[in-house]
Amino acid sequence: MMEQKTVHIGNMPIANDKPFTLFAGMNVLESRDLAMQICEHYVKVTEKLGIPYVFKASFDKANRSSVHSYRGPGMEEGLKIFQELKDTFGVKIITDIHTEAQAQPVADVVDVIQLPAFLARQTDLVEAMAKTGAVINVKKPQFMSPDQVGNIVDKFAECGNENIILCERGSCMGYDNLVVDMLGFGVMKKSSNGSPIIFDVTHALQMRDPSGAASGGRREQTVELAKAGIATGIAGLFLEAHPNPDQARCDGPSALPLDKLEPFLKQMKALDDLIKGFEHIEIK
């Protein structure tokens, strides 16, 4: 049986054979007050259910389809909001960066920095992120096979950072559609020598509208897709929720309604406990 690596976010262990961690929040920081509201709800629910939790939001959505789409408050204001969330709720935070210059300032505030899928092969950005010593979450590009993610892990290791989490978010299946290959989770574990794998169920539900500038989505299928991912035995779920998804400023069609969070997580925890309670069967 392949040994599973453990990455620590502070004193929080992240591994494929440990109880799942929730990396979740909102897509983009829309306002300080909304971030506080959403984070508080996540903290209350995860504490009640005993689920390890890391708050997620972006300060800049630098890869929006349209130049007219909302991008966020920017790094300076975003980091102020993140610091207030940490001070208020004692929560760990994950956010994404897009340039080398953002790496150290962001790593000084948050606990995990994320390498976006579209930038996952950019060596200069990888080097800058690695040098911070922070835990890194790598989004697997939609165009990359599960076998190839091991190359990204190796690149970070060559740059001196082995604190790597890998995130599945679906693969391109023809034009404007994403499909999650459930066999890919096991392949990613093997190709990365047991690195923690988390599943971004929210962005896996995106479906492009070829006639429009915004992404559509299939949030009504969140539960079934998340269950399928959890059943493969992974380290965590990556999720976005919103009090009113139809009014969200980014990716609302894929976001979970915030009032569904507790029943959703109850089912995910029950399934995760069941799956990880089974004896491992090794087939060669």
Curated annotation (Swiss-Prot):
Keywords: Cytoplasm, Lipopolysaccharide biosynthesis, Transferase. It catalyses: D-arabinose 5-phosphate + phosphoenolpyruvate + H2O = 3-deoxy-alpha-D-manno-2-octulosonate-8-phosphate + phosphate. Its EC number is 2.5.1.55. GO terms for biological process: keto-3-deoxy-D-manno-octulosonic acid biosynthetic process. Belongs to the KdsA family. NCBIfam families: KDO8P_synth, PRK05198.1, PRK12457.1. This is 2-dehydro-3-deoxyphosphooctonate aldolase. It comes from Vibrio atlanticus (strain LGP32). The lineage of its organism: Bacteria, Pseudomonadati, Pseudomonadota, Gammaproteobacteria, Vibrionales.
